[in-house]
A protein has these predicted regions:
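Glycine-rich FAD pyrophosphate-binding loop
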Residues: 5-9, 18-40
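Active-site flanking residues adjacent to catalytic metal/cofactor-binding acidic residues
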Residues: 7, 30, 139, 257-258
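Predominantly flavin-linked oxidoreductase catalytic cores and closely associated redox partners
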Residues: 9, 99-229, 246, 262
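N-terminal Rossmann-fold NAD(P) dinucleotide-binding loop
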Residues: 13-14
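A conserved beta-strand/loop capping segment in the N-terminal third of enzymes
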Residues: 43-99
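FAD/FMN-dependent oxidoreductases across multiple families
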Residues: 114, 206-282, 292-293
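C-terminal helical "tail/cap" subdomain of flavin- and related membrane-associated enzymes
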Residues: 283-337
Length: 337
């Protein structure tokens, strides 16, 4: 029998596994897809680096940028100062998984296709066999199987869409985020050392018509000579109402973390910081033999900040307000997720 099973080996699940091993608990990670690239730009903010200093010393290729640019819907360009790290998500996710395994976690490269609770235990079924675990952690993304089983799926209205390309060459020096004049979302151009990530996101699936075309037109206009080496599309949580979090994200023997919990900045789409925070807090709750306490821990740690951003998002993406917001950013040295 498995003591603690983590479904999902992305940043939330892998970091949680590593934290658990430091408390003498050696979990099993189930994931058949990670590591993988994503249209996510792989940016790590200065706040994330401050809270998790190991990020500054990860021995994988990355970029370090002291500034980045915002472009408003009307085309006004604003330079902001911040200390940003840029990672390939393939390499970043792989590092976190390897780190956890080296500390004693187990990785099973199988997809969990069904879950069933029997008494005080969970039965996890893969295509090969059935596993039994005492504690279950759902870190399996926006379409989380674990979430669907314990509290139900994230509502479609609370899901956004990203699409992106990876170009295997250094195209630009600067990070640039361009607010879309056509939808609630933005485009990005992010240098990542040997390659460059181009992407676009919308905060609402219902607003995703023409998403790929908008990115293609932007690239054709500004970078007509690049070669798109690969492409991705992915769903992301984008919670529209703080009351969504009135439902517990942890119970007597289960916890939801990261994207599965809906913990993503609803304005910027930043998820890595929340993934690491959730991984740390979930491991703390389990180490205290009280998985349910995760509800209290995450709410106290950053809940009010997240709720505030959810409320701000309602009016921020109105074009006149967004233009004003971009202007107020002038002179700000650091932004926090």
């Amino acid at each position: 029998m498995i003591q603690t099973a983590i479904v999902g080996g992305g940043p939330a699940g892998a970091y949680c596994a590593g934290c658990l091993t430091e408390n003498g608990i050696y979990p099993t990670i189930f994931d058949h897809t990670h590591p993988r690239e994503k249209p996510c730009g792989g940016l790590v903010s200065s706040l994330a680096q401050e809270l998790f200093p190991f990020l500054r010393h990860i021995p994988i290729e990355h970029t370090v940028k002291k500034k980045f640019y915002f472009v408003s819907p009307n085309g006004k360009k604003i330079c902001l100062r911040d200390n940003l790290l840029g990672f390939s998500r393939l390499m970043f996710d792989q590092y976190l998984v390897n780190r956890a395994v080296e500390k004693g976690a187990e990785l099973i490269n199988e997809k969990v296709v069904a879950l069933k609770r029997k008494g005080d235990f969970w039965h996890l079924k893969t295509k090969k066999q059935t596993y039994v675990t005492k504690i279950l952690i759902g870190a399996d993304g926006v379409n989380s199987l674990v979430r669907r089983k314990v509290i139900g799926p994230i509502s479609k209205k609370d899901i956004g869409l990203c699409f992106g390309y990876l170009v295997n060459e250094s195209v630009v020096e600067d990070i640039t985020l361009i607010f879309s004049p056509y939808r609630k979302g933005y485009l990005w151009v992010i240098p990542r050392g040997r390659n460059t990530c181009f992407g676009i996101c919308t905060t609402e699936i219902s607003d995703s018509y023409g998403l790929k075309k908008e990115l293609d037109m932007f690239i054709q206009k500004n970078y007509p000579n690049i070669t798109k080496d690969s492409s991705w599309a992915s769903l992301i949580p984008n919670i529209k109402d703080p009351r969504t979090f009135s439902v517990p994200l942890a119970g007597t023997n289960w916890i939801l973390i990261g994207d599965a919990a809906g913990h993503v900045n609803p304005i910027s789409g930043e998820g890595i910081l929340y993934a690491l925070l959730d991984g740390e807090l979930a491991s703390q709750a389990i180490a205290e033999n009280s998985p349910r306490r995760f509800n209290q821990l995450w709410t106290e740690r950053y809940g009010m900040n997240l709720f505030s951003k959810i409320k701000t998002r309602k009016w921020l993406y109105k074009k006149p307000v967004l233009e004003l917001y971009c202007q107020t950013l002038r002179g700000i040295s650091t932004l926090t997720p």
